[in-house]
Regions:
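Membrane-interface aromatic/basic loop that binds lipid-linked glycans or pyrophosphate carriers
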Residues: 90, 249-305
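Flexible helix-coil transition and linker loops at the boundaries of alpha-helical arrays
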Residues: 241-246
């Protein structure tokens, strides 16, 4: 929070979304609000997920541009907002990306070699934006929402495209991928900077996963939400790619690569129904590669067994 408050570009609003927290977060936020009238608190009555919370924050914002920041990350410099605002205005940008460093919470050490970035500064304009996004591995840096300065009008267009049906799902993972996929597909101009403006903190397992029964159950629930969120992204990926052979083939490849080969919890009984539904959506896509089709059919047979 201090890294936001201490920015030398002061004409900002700071919107904090409380997604049904059970700790003393509200108390801390209210103390901050007493000292800084730019802070606005929005509370979800119950946990609604990160996709819903982020879109709610955007809908309640007033500025021309928006950024998101996870609760445990920070900005690396106090002139980040001023640099990004001036660049976006100068080039009339819809999206402006930048680099992020990765820091271990245990060591507090920032390794300049351990960062997420494109290696050079460049500007691209439509139609090359959507081509770039689909053709690189969409798990990588291009999908981190916190690494972009975004024109609000573009974000509102994406929210409208998603509609209440998707936004109201309790999506608690892959929300950045969903949003960046649609933002990239609808942006008219994008610039990437190689400057490191953002720090991502990595928490060791002993802080995030407890061996206690209670926390083991919570972790399993997290796994379930993660798989359900990816299924939603897979559905969106297929729905919003262009109706041509190349794009649909790429969408299918991403689905296969992520869900079958990386997702370890897709046999959970409560999401099998959704898994089968999404698999059938891909099977009914006439542009799906034969190898992908065979892999999905084989997978569905395993589920039946």
């Amino acid at each position: 929070m201090r890294s936001v408050q201490n920015q030398n570009f002061t004409d900002i609003e700071i919107i904090i979304i409380d997604d049904g927290s059970m700790d003393n977060s509200i108390k801390v936020i209210k103390e901050l609000m007493k000292e800084d009238n730019r802070i606005k608190l929005i509370r979800n009555i119950e946990n609604r997920g990160t996709l819903y919370s982020k879109t709610r924050g955007i809908l309640n914002s007033k500025g021309k541009y928006v950024m998101t920041l996870d609760h445990d990350d920070l900005y690396a410099r106090n002139n980040v907002f001023s640099i990004l605002f001036n660049e976006a205005e100068k080039y009339n940008l819809d999206l402006l990306g930048f680099a992020s460093n990765i820091c271990s919470v245990e060591t507090k050490y920032l390794n300049r070699e351990n960062y997420i970035s494109y290696l050079k500064t460049f500007i691209i304009k439509k139609p090359n934006i959507k081509k770039r996004f689909l053709n690189h591995n969409i798990k990588q840096s291009g999908t981190l929402l916190c690494m972009y300065f975004i024109k609000k009008s573009l974000f509102l267009k994406v929210i409208n495209l998603l509609g209440k049906e998707f936004i109201n799902r309790n999506i608690d993972a892959h929300d950045d991928t969903i949003l960046m996929f649609l933002l990239s597909r609808n942006a008219l101009s994008l610039k990437h900077l190689k400057d490191i403006f953002h720090v991502i903190f990595i928490w060791p397992k002993k802080y995030s996963i407890s061996l206690s029964f209670h926390h083991t159950i919570k972790f399993k629930e997290r796994e379930r939400k993660n798989c359900y969120s990816f299924l939603t992204f897979s559905e969106i990926l297929l729905l919003f790619t262009e109706n041509n052979k190349n794009d649909k083939k790429i969408a299918s490849n991403h689905f296969i690569q992520w869900y079958f080969k990386i997702g370890k919890c897709h046999y959970k009984k409560d999401i099998i129904k959704d898994t089968v539904r999404i698999c059938n959506l891909y099977l009914n896509n006439k542009y799906i590669a034969k190898s992908s089709k065979n892999e999905i059919l084989s997978y569905l047979q395993c589920l039946k067994n």
